[in-house]
Amino acid sequence: MNFLVISGEFPPFAGGSGTYCNYLIKALAARGHKITLITKHYKENAEQEKKIDLALSEQNIKCIRMPYFKFTFIFSWYRIISNYLKRHNDFDFVILNGNIAQLVCRKPALRKFLKKYITFQHGLSAYDTLDKNRFAALFYKRQMLDNFFKNAAANIAVSRELKDKLEQSVKMPNLHVILNCIDNEAFTFIPQNKDKNALHLTTASRLIPGKNTIAVVRLFTKLRNDFPNLYLNIAGTGSELERLKEEAERLQVTPFVNFSGQLNTKELCKLYQQSDVFILLSFYESFGLVYLEANACGVPVIGSDVGGTREAIEDGVSGFIVPLDDENIIYEKTKLLLSDTALRQKMGNAGKKRVDEKFSLDTLGKNFEKLLNGLKAEEA
């Protein structure tokens, strides 16, 4: 089949939405589908972007990058996408991944070019953007979004928890679930020559308030009283970076904290492989891809008991799910993993097996094709 995929997020800089899109198009291309991607241009990462786009072209994926300006993208993207669809309107489906793509394409004048479209939801959807962004609210009405999602061939949530939340909060119709998956060929377990005299606790995410990385820094400081050989790796960039550095300085742990910055897939995989425990204490996750990535590299994980984390982590098997409001439990579970090598290996191995069996690119491709076959059957 021939797909046009429109996504506001995509590597080199991407959160869960962009990463999911990257995996989805690779999974579909591997199964013989034709893919054209329209996404954001990152001028500050132009060289890395070129490498990513070259790799996509080698998989027969065409990538079109568009400039993004926070307050005017609605108009510029609308014009570019409309003109493109006027010239190329032979797609079987248009996939609209995330809020930006859905806000742009919900316009009636553009929707007439969208014969069949499928939306992917990664959070509280475009409704949330509308509620928070006064500028967007000037041009979009809630009823327009209601009609937009009603007319979609399918609306897909990346976790069962998110599906339930969308049905309850905005009554989104025609919702299906296709769980997040990862590239388990890129994230693999390779035994590393780890420093036997050191332990490494790792976290990776966008460094924004919602990821609650500051709680990890404070937990790490407390754990160093038990493990003087413990080091903390923080991968990612974002608005919280300077605050985190200041907190590490205040707690006098700066020499033991490594801020890795933004890492590509290969670098992130290597970081996981060198880690003993992965932790992310977000206030909310629609799923939590990083838990799967770490598990795929043989690392046990700890995540907060929120949202789709409950589906990403099998509690007591691939890691631990901990309550955000109980610092003692978070501390005790992390301490347990750091102190028990056999338990770390057991959970790391179980996590890797689980990812390979349930969350591979092949699984993602099969699940999406299964959905498409169901849509065809409904039409017949």
Give short role names for the model-derived ranges.
Residues 193-220, 224, 233:
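Conserved donor-binding/catalytic core segment of Leloir-type glycosyltransferases
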Residues 137-155:
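Membrane-proximal helix-turn-helix segments that form the acceptor-binding/catalytic region
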Residues 7, 45, 76-79, 93-126:
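An aromatic- and histidine-rich active-site surface loop
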Residues 283:
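Aromatic "clamp/platform" in nucleotide-sugar-dependent glycosyltransferases that forms part
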